[in-house]
Design a protein with these regions (language model features):
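Functional transmembrane core segments of multi-pass inner-membrane proteins
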Residues: 20, 133-241, 284-289
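C-terminal ends of transmembrane helices
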Residues: 32-37, 96-104, 144-154, 197-209, ...
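Select subsegments of transmembrane alpha-helices in polytopic membrane proteins
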Residues: 107-115, 159
Length: 289
């Protein structure tokens, strides 16, 4: 069956782009679940580990929660979301952004994540075409969206996302899917050490922690996928965009100077751009030197 589908998509690229976009919309719906539930699951695990370490009695068993069960419910009235109410974007528009049971407003985040994931998936398919690169670039893209969403909401980049991506990037380099093994391994080490070094120097000078350890791991992930040569592009792009947005928010009084701003989404965006357009960005930056 696959041997028939691939030639069809190669001959009908827009059918392929449309198919991947629809898959992206569906995955976006699942990413909303990941963004919401994974931090809760981690918090429960940490609390349980702390109680065990302190030799304290375990807390009362909570309802089982993972990425699959229980089915999504309205946080206000407990109404279980039906399949028809869970169609990406369409259900939100049909319900006019409200719960069908209690009319509580549904957060705009949900359709936005679905739409954004669909758009990103389309761009990846359009850029790489019918290839293994598309498959793995989609996995990275979707994971970066989930990680960014969690970082924005909780200032946390879960190891459950970053570490599997790190090893997957290195594994793919054995087969030269994006880069070779040498570039991947050096990229991972250099990515981690570069931000770790900045963190240490900043802490020595100011006595404060300027960024989280998850940022080191995320840059290591990106280095493993795009190679050490594009780390400069990722760091420069993420820093410029992050500084611009941060300064703008301060000027507009949307935040204060002491407010922590998650850096993960900027790293993720710069890394994603580097995966697709790294060489072009490299040439653009070095044209100013």
């Amino acid at each position: 069956m696959i041997s028939q589908i691939i030639p069809f998509f190669e001959q009908s690229p827009w059918a392929f782009y449309s198919y991947i976009t629809i898959i992206g919309l569906l995955v976006g719906s699942f990413l909303n679940v990941v963004i919401y539930r994974l931090p809760i699951m981690m918090q429960r695990e940490w609390r349980g580990d702390c109680l065990e370490f302190l030799k304290q009695p375990a807390e009362k068993a909570e309802d089982k929660l993972n990425l699959w069960l229980p089915r999504s419910r309205c946080g206000e009235c407990g109404h279980q979301i039906t399949a028809l109410e869970n169609i990406p974007i369409i259900s939100y528009l049909f319900l006019r952004g409200k719960c069908s049971s209690c009319n509580t407003h549904i957060a705009i985040q949900y359709p936005l994540v679905e739409l954004f994931t669909g758009i990103i998936s389309f761009i990846v398919a359009w850029h790489f075409g019918v290839s293994l690169q598309t498959l793995f670039a989609l996995i990275l893209s979707w994971s970066l969206i989930a990680a960014s969403g969690i970082d924005i909401g909780h200032k946390l980049l879960p190891d459950d996302l970053t570490l599997p991506l790190l090893w997957l990037g290195i594994l793919l380099s054995f087969f030269d899917i994006f880069i070779n093994l040498e570039s991947s391994v050096i990229g991972a080490m250099a990515g981690y050490m570069s931000l770790w070094s900045v963190y240490i120097v900043f802490k020595i000078i100011t006595g404060k922690e300027g960024m989280g350890h998850g940022d080191f791991k995320l840059l290591a992930v990106l280095g493993a996928w795009v190679g050490w040569k594009l780390l400069f592009v990722i760091i420069l792009t993420s820093s410029l965009v992050g500084a611009t947005i941060g300064i703008t928010m301060i000027l507009l009084k949307k935040t204060s100077r002491g407010t922590q701003i998650p850096f993960g989404p900027y790293l993720a965006a710069a890394g994603w751009l580097s995966l697709l357009y790294g060489e072009q960005l490299n040439r653009f930056y070095f044209s100013f030197l």
